[in-house]
């Protein structure tokens, strides 16, 4: 790479994370002759590269986390070297050269986490040393001469070594600010040197065997010491010397043996963090309440109880974190909940019984951890806090009002919810009402006075002649009313408020602020607005506004610069004129603004108007990998890159191929197809053609792009393949230099807004890392992206584009690597895929409609809050307040059944056998199997309606008709009588275990035949098991029997079978369904049929009709009828009453006698509701009384009321929003039933799909396993 590029202007670069093993260190680093700092962390270096010798201006070198065994090389030849960071290597004493300590400017040395056994020789010669880190080595002694010379040290870290003593010369370190000695066996070190270190700010002595006897008696002279760590020692009480520290802000005394605290802790008036975890504390002194600046208090793993916490702890008004886990707390003081800034409250592993109700008023709380407190009962939320949820008022009174209840009902519900009257509360309400009445009167008086004053001023203005003071006529422009426009989108609030120069550049019709470093540099094809702010003779702010026109500028830029210059004048309220300046013809006043130092640069931004250009697409091929979120890895454009285990995406611009290998997963194929759809939609404007290819079925055009079809497609990608970690660089541009630091995206400070906690540990790229004012280079090994922020300076963009090309050429990269440019807002889909949860969707508050958002803008205070209250989300809970549907009387059901059967002219049945429907035998009518599909063709008579004679017929016509002969009139009447009409309905019945092939077979075969036989008279009704049409059920006259399995397979089995006869809401909805053969399912209010088969040829078995003692007599008679019609004479039949069961066959056949229910009271109260958002808003609807297990929708919430409990059933695909809203609806329903049925209070229970209890399942007829998705 020639030195004519941008490399000589690079002042700093971070190449960490690249792989430089095996001699891959870039030679072009030598061209960075102006390099000041260089980071080579985690690059696999085993020795220092020779190219460092050319960097004569290098000041900072970082080679941490490598495999270096020596620092010998060219370091001593770098005269400007100031800092050497070589932590986490394999350095020994022999690998540290002596001559580096002769460098005059060496001030920072970090050799921590190495294998040193003693201090490096000649270290004392580095007299300008400021920072020295030798921690995590094996050093056992410090030479006395070291601290005689290194007296200017500011930071010293000797932690995790083997030091047993410290040299007395340490008292010479009077400038030392940070001293870290953690993890050294300093038992006999008295630390008498500490009082002499007057500038000390941080002192860490963790795990150094500190006791009361080996600490200084006083540290009063250390007035700057603010951070002390004495954790993991043997202290039995707080050392007295700590009470003398006036500036202490952070104190860590954790993991000691401290049993009590002194009252002297109130001397730490500036303390912000106090850690007393893992001690023996039983109580805290009341003096701790005086630490008003305390923000973090850690008391984990002590012996504190409720009495051990002072009642005045609420005085800690700055407290943000309180952690007291693993103690003996039964309660916490209520005053703790009065700390207004409390964000984190950790109380797990205690003995908590409850918490103060004030816990709900902690507005800043973010973490509340009360786990492993088995006896804890959370306090109820205040009523006013539970009223609204997702902007919906769930109070019982409001929902009754919305449901159309009478005012008396609403008032009664309010009385039920209010409970007993509180005379004290009534007194306070009256007092507040009185005060508010006075406030209203005062507001009315003030409003009246202000209206009078405004009217008076208006009259005075109208009466005054249009003359200025002194009798002079006002200028015409002073009488003009300036339009009230909002310029905040273009100019910030601080514009023109401080003396100085501010410049904007016109880009896409709007002004963009130019950084101060680029003032005086104008692009020939651009236009600028220049604002000079200064103080006039009177000390007031004044302004000069210019708009500069480039010689090559387009018309849109010229017009916008003039317009926005006037907008700026109006925004500032300035009276000056806007002055036009043209390139090459600037005025003297304009040149003086820049001290006659302006320069012109060729180029400029594109015009704001659209231009039509032919887009050039680069052909790329990507390998798709990943499981949950797919990632794309570019591969060479050749057939040998294909691997049968992966999916590949070939992007040819307007042709996109998705190639699926023979061993690739269907999931990745689908995700790759969706990815291609996004590319087509967002980048190709929907013009691209997407083709899905399967290995072995590729068209010739596909292989032409890849240079021909390979002889064999092999598995060549390693099983443990994972691409290198992406590296994100931020391009920095200063006066004559470039910098390229890496973004450590594991640190939250690098993000524009703090990301979610779960995304931080994984080193993931997040969109919040990108700042619109900056330019970034994303190095993904085989892809290099240059991301340009919308508000980034143009010079930085140009430098980044050039630097990205040179960086790609300098580092070892594959040949198919491409450098691409991405502008903010128009990023390619491949670029977005590198980031975690890239979000293109605008943040929208779905709890408010569009009109409410528009109306709410600009409102503030009480007006805004009132507006939000009126714009609540729609929610329909009316079904919860309707009475339960009463059961249909038996006489009415039989009458309806008779009418429907009178209209039935004929009924033919068909059953699916194999792949075709065959006629159902007559003896099997009424018998259905759960794995079969049935079709019933029903022909109904349609009543004939005779037309009445028209009343307007004239009398002459009547007379002539009467005059006809009798036979002719009779024949004519017979001809006019219409024929009786009919209608055909085809009922398709599908068992809950049957596949959808039956419906498809019926649709394409039998239905076509029926439509040809009965054109225009055919209606098809599709039904599933236990969700049948009542009219269809009526044709079987209550003898509707459902067996498990398939017809011919099940009929020959010798296993006992049990059937339950049950009526749901109406005699029309009576079914006899096979259930599990288990005596615990019996119920005294129902009738059951038990079939016990025999192996004998003469007698196939015995069948019992079991009649419960509390069953309905009509159902008992029906059970006997079903018994006789369901089984032929080959079975012995017997009707038995409850309590008369024979032991031999009945209890043996049913599987032994077990306890069972003796009543079915729940049948009189059972109701099923569905809670869903499918209508676009939250609504609750009630299922009919004839519901079944399949009515439980997996993506919704179901509410089941059995008269004692209200079960909230949660499906596996239910959203969190529906769960929260349904919980509120449950609470409203329970409140309503409490007001209607005092004698039957309901309890709320949660049921998840697959974990239903017996009390829940018995409400459903023939409960079984859940139905799988039909094939």
UniProtKB/Swiss-Prot annotation:
Residue ranges with Basic and acidic residues bias: 952-967
Cellular localisation: Nucleus; Cytoplasm, Cytoskeleton; Cytoplasm, Cytoskeleton, Microtubule organizing center, Centrosome; Cell junction, Focal adhesion
Modified residues (N-acetylmethionine): 1
Inducing stimuli: Up-regulated in response to wounding.
Ranges in a coiled coil: none
GO biological process, one term: actin filament severing
Biased composition (Acidic residues): 968-977
Assembly notes: Interacts with actin, ACTL6A and NCOA2. Interacts with CARM1. Interacts with LRRFIP1, LRRFIP2 and MYD88. Upon LPS stimulation, LRRFIP2 competes for MYD88-binding; LRRFIP1 constitutively blocks the interaction with MyD88, even in the absence of LPS. Interacts with the nuclear receptors ESR1 and THRB. Interacts with SGK3. Interacts (via the gelsolin-like region) with TMOD1 and TMOD3. Interacts with LMOD2, VCL, GSN and DES.
Stated name of the protein: Protein flightless-1 homolog
Taxonomic placement: Eukaryota, Metazoa, Chordata, Craniata, Vertebrata
């Amino acid at each position: 790479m020639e030195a004519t590029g941008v490399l000589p202007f690079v002042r700093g670069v971070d190449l960490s994370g690249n792989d430089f093993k095996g001699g891959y260190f870039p030679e072009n680093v030598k061209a960075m002759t102006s390099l000041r700092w260089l980071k080579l962390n985690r690059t696999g270096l085993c020795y220092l590269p020779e190219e460092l010798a050319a960097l004569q201006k290098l000041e900072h070198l970082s080679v941490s986390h490598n495999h270096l065994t020596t620092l010998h090389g060219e370091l001593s030849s770098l005269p400007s070297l100031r800092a050497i960071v070589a932590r986490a290597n394999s350095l020994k004493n022999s690998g540290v050269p002596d001559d580096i300590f002769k460098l005059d400017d060496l001030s920072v040395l970090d050799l921590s986490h190495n294998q040193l056994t003693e201090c490096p020789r000649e270290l004392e010669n580095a007299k300008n040393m400021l920072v020295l880190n030798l921690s995590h080595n094996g050093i056992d002694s410090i030479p006395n001469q070291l601290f005689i010379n290194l007296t200017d040290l500011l930071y010293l870290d000797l932690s995790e070594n083997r030091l047993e003593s410290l040299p007395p010369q340490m008292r010479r370190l009077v400038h030392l600010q940070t001293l870290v000695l953690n993890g050294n066996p300093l038992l006999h070190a008295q630390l008498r040197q500490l009082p002499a270190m007057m500038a000390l700010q941080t002192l860490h002595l963790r795990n150094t065997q500190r006791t009361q006897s080996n600490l200084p008696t006083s540290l009063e002279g250390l007035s700057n010491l603010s951070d002390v760590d004495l954790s993991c020692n043997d202290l039995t009480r707080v050392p007295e010397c700590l009470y003398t520290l006036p500036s202490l802000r952070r104190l860590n005394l954790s993991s000691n043996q401290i049993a009590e605290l002194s009252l002297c802790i109130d001397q730490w008036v500036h303390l912000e963090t106090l850690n007393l975890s893992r001690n023996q504390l039983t109580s805290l002194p009341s003096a701790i309440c005086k630490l008003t600046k305390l923000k973090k208090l850690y008391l984990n793993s002590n012996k504190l109880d409720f009495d051990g916490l002072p009642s005045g702890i609420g005085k800690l008004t700055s407290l943000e974190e309180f952690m007291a886990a693993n103690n003996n707390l039964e309660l916490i003081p209520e005053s703790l909940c009065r700390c207004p800034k409390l964000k984190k409250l950790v109380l797990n592993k205690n003995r908590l019984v409850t918490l103060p109700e004030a816990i709900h008023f902690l507005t800043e709380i973010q973490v509340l951890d009360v786990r492993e407190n088995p006896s804890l009962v959370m306090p109820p939320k205040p009523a006013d806090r539970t009223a609204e949820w997702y902007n919906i008022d769930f109070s019982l009174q409001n929902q009754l009002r919305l449901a159309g209840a009478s005012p008396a009902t609403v008032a009664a519900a309010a009385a039920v919810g209010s409970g007993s009257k509180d005379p004290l509360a009534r007194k306070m309400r009256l007092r507040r009402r009185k005060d508010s009445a006075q406030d209203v009167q005062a507001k009315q008086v003030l409003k009246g006075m202000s209206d009078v004053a405004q009217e008076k001023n208006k009259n005075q203005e109208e009466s005054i002649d249009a003359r200025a003071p002194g009798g002079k006529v006002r200028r015409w422009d002073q009488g003009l009313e300036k339009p009230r426009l909002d310029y905040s989108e273009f100019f910030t609030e601080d514009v023109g408020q401080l003396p100085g120069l501010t410049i904007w550049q016109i880009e896409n019709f709007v002004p963009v602020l130019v950084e101060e470093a680029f003032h005086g540099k104008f692009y020939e094809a651009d236009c600028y607005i220049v604002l000079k702010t200064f103080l006039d003779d009177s000390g007031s702010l004044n302004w000069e506004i210019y708009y500069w026109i480039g010689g090559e500028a387009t018309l849109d830029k010229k017009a916008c610069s003039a317009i926005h210059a006037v907008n700026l004048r109006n925004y500032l309220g300035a009276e000056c004129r806007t002055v036009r300046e043209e390139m090459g013809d600037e005025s003297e006043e304009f040149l003086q603004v820049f001290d006659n130092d302006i320069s012109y640069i060729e180029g400029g931004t594109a015009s704001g108007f659209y231009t039509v250009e032919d887009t050039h697409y680069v052909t790329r091929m990507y390998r798709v990998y990943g499981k949950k979120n797919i990632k794309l890895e570019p591969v060479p454009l050749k057939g040998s890159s294909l691997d049968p285990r992966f999916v590949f995406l070939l992007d040819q611009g307007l042709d996109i191929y998705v190639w699926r290998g023979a061993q690739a997963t269907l999931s990745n194929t689908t995700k790759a197809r969706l990815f291609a759809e996004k590319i087509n939609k967002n980048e190709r404007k929907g013009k691209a053609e997407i083709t899905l290819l399967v290995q072995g079925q590729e068209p010739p055009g596909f292989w032409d792009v890849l240079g021909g079809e390979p002889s064999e497609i092999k598995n060549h990608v390693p099983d443990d393949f994972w691409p290198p970690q992406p590296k994100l660089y931020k391009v920095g541009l200063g006066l004559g230099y470039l910098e390229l630091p890496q973004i450590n995206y594991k640190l939250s400070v690098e993000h524009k807004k703090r990301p979610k906690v779960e995304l931080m540990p994984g080193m993931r790229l997040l969109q919040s890392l990108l700042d619109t004012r900056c330019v970034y280079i994303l190095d993904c090994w085989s892809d290099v992206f240059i991301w340009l922020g919308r508000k980034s300076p143009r010079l930085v963009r140009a430098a980044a584009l050039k630097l990205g090309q040179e960086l790609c050429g300098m580092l070892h990269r594959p040949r198919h690597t491409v450098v691409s440019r991405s502008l903010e807002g128009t990023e390619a889909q491949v670029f977005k895929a590198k980031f975690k949860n890239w979000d293109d969707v605008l943040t929208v508050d779905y709890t408010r409609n569009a009109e409410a958002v528009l109306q709410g803008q600009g409102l503030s205070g009480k007006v805004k809050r009132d507006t939000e209250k009126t714009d609540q989300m729609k929610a329909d809970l009316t079904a919860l307040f309707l009475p339960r549907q009463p059961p249909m009387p038996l006489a009415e059901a039989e009458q309806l059944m008779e009418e429907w059967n009178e209209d039935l002219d004929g009924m033919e049945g068909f059953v699916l056998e194999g792949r075709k429907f065959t006629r159902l035998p007559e003896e099997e009518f009424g018998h259905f199997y759960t794995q079969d599909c049935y079709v019933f063709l029903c022909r109904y008579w349609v009543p004939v309606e005779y037309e009445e004679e028209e009343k307007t017929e004239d009398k002459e016509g009547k007379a002539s008709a009467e005059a006809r002969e009798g036979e002719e009139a009779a024949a004519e009447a017979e001809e006019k009588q219409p024929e009786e009409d009919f209608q055909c309905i085809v009922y398709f019945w599908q068992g809950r275990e049957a596949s959808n092939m039956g419906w498809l077979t019926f649709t394409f075969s039998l239905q076509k035949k029926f439509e040809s036989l009965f054109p225009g008279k055919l209606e098809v009704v599709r039904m599933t098991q236990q969700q049948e049409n009542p009219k269809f059920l009526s044709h079987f006259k209550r003898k509707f029997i459902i067996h498990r399995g398939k017809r011919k397979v099940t009929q020959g089995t010798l296993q006992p079978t049990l059937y339950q006869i049950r009526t749901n809401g109406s005699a029309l909805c009576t079914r006899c369904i096979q259930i599990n053969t288990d005596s615990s399912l019996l119920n005294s209010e129902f009738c059951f049929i038990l079939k016990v088969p025999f192996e004998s040829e003469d007698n196939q078995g015995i069948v019992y009709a079991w009649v419960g003692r509390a069953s309905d007599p009509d159902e008992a008679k029906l059970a006997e009828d079903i018994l006789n019609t369901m089984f032929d004479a080959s079975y012995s039949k017997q009707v038995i009453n409850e309590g008369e069961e024979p032991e031999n066959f009945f209890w043996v056949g049913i599987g032994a006698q077990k306890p069972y229910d003796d009543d079915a009271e729940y049948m009189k109260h059972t109701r099923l509701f569905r809670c869903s958002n499918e209508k676009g808003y939250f609504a609750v609807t009630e299922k009919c009384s004839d519901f079944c297990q399949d009515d439980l929708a997996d993506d919704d919430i179901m509410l089941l009321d059995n008269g004692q409990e209200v079960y909230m059933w949660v499906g596996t695909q239910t959203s969190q929003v529906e769960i929260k809203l349904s919980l509120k609806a449950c609470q409203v329903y329970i409140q309503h039933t409490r007001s209607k049925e005092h004698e039957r209070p309901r309890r709320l229970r949660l049921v998840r799909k697959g974990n239903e209890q017996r009390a829940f399942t018995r409400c459903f007829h023939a409960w079984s396993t859940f139905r799988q998705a039909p094939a």
